[in-house]
């Protein structure tokens, strides 16, 4: 077979043969096989050219995808699937990129965890979930998590939460709110509790009294329409307890309020 045409088409070249066959190849393919117009190639050589062209095309696509930011193996595989590249060729591309250090799931996991350590707010459980969604193996995630102490991150998040809620919630509700937020962000209950205990949190009696009377004003308007006397007192006690106020503070406030 003889090559009758080699014509550039955007990123690829169109190669035509004298038997009517056509295929798109990359510039790397032309260089590797020293292709030119009128060159004679065999069926076997054509197959090699087509396979390498797909590999070269897939690698170029992957490198373009990786040029914007680091990606995991799973992310690159999914990207290449969109271009209908043969699965075997995709595996070859991935292996080549891993060999050349373009893809390294271990380094990717370390970088994500390290960035979180410096300025993030996630605990190990949420990070594990996020990295697993990226296709990183459980063993790789665990190996990298061992390199970090999350107590500083938990403390940083706890301090921010304290600034947000202090003066707005009674002591017990403040503790519950901060610990719940920390566990939602992926910290264990024990780490969340330690972070809270290390806070300089002081909800004084005056603040508690101010908060409870403010809440009573709101709840009294709601319940006084339906209840009175003992039943009203019970309803107010229940709703204030659910909001984190101690029963002794509730009883004291109700004596003054009612």
Curated annotation (Swiss-Prot):
The keyword Kinase does not apply. It is found in: Cytoplasm. It comes from Streptococcus pneumoniae (strain ATCC BAA-255 / R6). The keyword Cytoplasm applies. Belongs to the RecX family. One of its GO terms (biological process) is regulation of DNA repair. Keywords: Cytoplasm. Modulates RecA activity. Its main location: cytoplasm. The lineage of its organism: Bacteria, Bacillati, Bacillota, Bacilli, Lactobacillales. One of its GO terms (cellular component) is cytoplasm. This is Regulatory protein RecX.
């Amino acid at each position: 077979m003889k090559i009758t045409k080699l014509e550039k088409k955007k990123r690829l070249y169109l190669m035509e043969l004298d038997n009517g066959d056509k295929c798109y190849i990359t510039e790397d393919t032309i260089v590797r096989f020293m292709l030119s117009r009128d060159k004679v190639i065999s069926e076997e050589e054509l197959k090699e050219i087509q396979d390498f062209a797909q590999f070269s095309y897939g690698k170029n696509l992957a490198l373009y995808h990786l040029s914007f930011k680091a990606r995991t193996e799973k992310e690159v595989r999914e990207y290449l699937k969109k271009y209908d590249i043969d699965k075997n060729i995709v595996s070859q591309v991935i292996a080549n990129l891993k060999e050349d250090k373009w893809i390294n799931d271990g380094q990717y996991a370390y970088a994500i965890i390290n960035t979180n350590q410096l300025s993030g707010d996630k605990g190990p459980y949420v990070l594990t979930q996020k990295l697993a969604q990226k296709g990183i193996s459980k063993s790789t995630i665990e190996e990298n998590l061992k390199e970090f102490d999350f107590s500083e991150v938990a403390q940083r998040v706890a301090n921010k939460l304290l600034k947000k809620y202090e003066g707005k919630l009674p002591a017990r509700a403040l503790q519950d709110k901060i610990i719940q937020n920390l566990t939602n962000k992926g910290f264990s209950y024990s780490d969340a509790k330690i972070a809270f205990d290390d806070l300089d949190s002081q909800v004084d009696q005056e603040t508690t009294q101010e908060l409870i009377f403010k809440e009573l004003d709101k709840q009294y308007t709601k319940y006084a329409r339906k209840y009175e006397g003992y039943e009203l007192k019970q309803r107010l006690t229940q709703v204030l307890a659910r909001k984190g106020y101690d029963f002794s503070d509730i009883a004291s406030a109700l004596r003054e309020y009612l």
